[in-house]
Regions:
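Structured alpha/beta or helical-core interaction and ligand-binding surfaces enriched in interleaved
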Residues: 1-148
C-alpha cells in the first residue's frame, strides 16, 4: 500500500476545500445530514461491501476517468494521498485508524463517503450516472432519503 500522510496546513486546506465544494457542514454528511447538492446517491453499505465486483467496478470507473491518486480524509482527522488501487471506501476498513472516511481527487468533481450508519454515498454527476447505468438494481439499494 502506497500511502502518504498529508500534514498540518495542507491537510486543513484540502479538507476545507472538500467541505466547501460538497456542502459538508457537520461531522456527518449525506444522507445523515442535509446537503444542497443534487448529484448524490447513498446506498446501503452492504450492497457494495458484500459484492466484490462492485468495489472493482468503482476502481475501474475512476481509473477510466484518469484518476490515479486520491485524497483520503479519515474521521480521526488524518489526511492521506493514496493510489486509486488502495481505495477501500468502507467504514472501518483501516482498523484502529478507521471509521468514517471521505475520498476524492484533487479536482473534487466526485466524492465517496462511508458513514458509521451503514451507508456509502457517491457524489458527482458523472460518477452517479455511471453507477446507475451499470448497477441496474440500484433503486432497490438506496438508503434513507437518497435523492436520486
Amino acid at each position: 500500500m502506497d500511502k502518504e500522510q498529508i500534514h498540518d496546513e495542507v491537510s486543513l486546506s484540502l479538507r476545507n476545500e472538500m467541505e466547501s465544494v460538497w456542502d459538508i457542514n457537520r461531522r456527518y454528511w449525506y444522507p445523515l445530514n442535509e446537503c444542497k447538492r443534487s448529484d448524490l446517491i447513498a446506498f446501503n453499505a452492504d450492497y457494495i461491501e458484500d459484492d466484490k465486483s462492485k468495489h472493482e467496478f468503482i476502481l475501474t470507473v475512476l481509473k477510466e476517468h484518469g484518476i490515479e491518486q486520491i485524497y483520503e480524509f479519515l474521521e480521526t482527522g488524518e489526511t492521506y494521498r493514496i493510489q486509486i488501487s488502495d481505495l477501500h471506501p468502507f467504514y472501518g476498513y483501516y482498523g484502529a485508524i478507521g471509521g468514517e472516511g471521505f475520498w476524492c481527487s484533487d479536482k473534487m468533481d466526485w466524492i465517496i463517503y462511508a458513514s458509521h450508519e451503514g451507508t456509502i454515498t457517491f457524489g458527482g454527476e458523472w460518477l452517479v450516472s455511471k453507477l446507475k447505468s451499470v448497477w441496474i438494481d440500484w433503486r432497490n439499494h438506496v438508503d434513507w432519503d437518497s435523492k436520486n
